[in-house]
C-alpha cells in the first residue's frame, strides 16, 4: 500500500479504472499528490503490479454496476476511466459509473467519435492523450520552444530561451507583452530554480522563460528567441 503525502479528505479521493500505461501513470501521479486512489482493473497481472504502489487496488469488471458497488467505487466522488483500446468496455464503464452516482467522470478517448459517445453516457471530461501529445511534439519540432502546453481555448504556455537582447535587462524594460503579446510567468537562470516574474525581474544571459499567451503569440515569440 502506498503512503500519502498528506491525509486526504473524502472529496480528494479518486478511483482510476484501467491500469494500463495511461491509467497507471495517472493513478501513480495522484498518489504522489496526496490523493487516496482506488485502482480497478480486470487483469490480475496489472492488479498485482500496482498493489504496492497505489492506496488500494482491486480486480473487478468495471462494466458491472454491482461489481463496482461491491468494491466501494460508489463512495468516490471522482473517477478516471483509462480504458482506451476496448471502446465497448470504456463506454459501458462510464455508463456504470453514472448509474451508481459518481459525480465527476474523466474518460480517455481514442477518437472524436469515441469522445462524443463517452460524453453522451455521462463523462463530463474527455481526454485525448495521444492527440495532445502528438500536437505538443509537433510544436516542439517546428519551433525553438523547449516545452509547450496548449489549452482548448487557444491559450498556451511555453518554456523557451530568453531573447539575446533581453540579457541584463528587466522585464519591464524588455516589454515582451507590448512586442509579442505574451506574459512572462517565470524566469530561470542556470543552476537556479524558477522564480515568479515581476516587472523588476532582471533576465541574465542564457535564461529560460515561461511565457503565456494565445498559441499564435507564443509561437511568434518563440520563433524570435
PLM segments and residue spans:
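Cytosolic regulatory regions of ion transport systems
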Residues: 1-225
Amino acid at each position: 500500500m502506498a503512503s500519502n503525502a498528506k491525509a486526504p479528505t473524502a472529496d480528494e479521493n479518486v478511483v482510476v479504472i484501467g491500469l494500463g500505461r495511461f491509467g497507471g501513470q495517472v493513478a501513480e501521479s495522484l498518489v504522489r499528490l496526496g490523493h487516496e486512489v482506488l485502482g480497478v482493473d480486470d487483469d490480475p497481472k496489472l492488479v498485482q503490479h500496482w498493489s504496492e504502489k497505489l492506496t488500494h487496488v482491486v480486480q473487478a469488471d468495471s462494466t458491472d454496476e454491482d461489481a463496482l458497488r461491491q468494491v466501494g467505487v460508489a463512495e468516490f466522488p471522482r473517477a478516471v476511466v483509462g480504458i482506451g483500446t476496448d471502446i465497448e468496455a470504456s463506454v459501458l464503464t462510464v455508463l456504470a459509473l453514472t448509474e451508481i452516482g459518481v459525480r465527476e467522470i474523466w474518460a480517455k478517448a481514442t477518437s472524436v467519435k469515441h469522445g462524443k459517445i463517452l460524453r453522451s453516457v455521462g463523462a463530463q471530461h474527455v481526454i485525448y492523450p495521444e492527440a495532445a501529445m502528438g500536437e505538443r511534439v509537433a510544436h516542439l519540432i517546428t519551433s525553438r520552444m523547449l516545452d509547450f502546453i496548449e489549452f482548448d481555448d487557444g491559450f498556451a504556455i511555453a518554456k523557451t530561451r530568453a531573447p539575446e537582447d533581453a540579457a541584463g535587462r528587466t522585464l519591464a524594460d524588455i516589454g515582451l507583452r507590448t512586442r509579442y503579446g505574451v506574459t512572462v510567468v517565470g524566469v530561470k537562470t542556470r543552476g537556479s530554480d524558477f522564480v515568479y516574474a515581476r516587472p523588476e525581474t532582471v533576465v541574465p544571459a542564457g535564461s529560460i522563460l515561461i511565457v503565456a499567451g494565445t498559441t499564435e503569440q507564443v509561437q511568434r515569440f518563440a520563433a524570435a528567441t
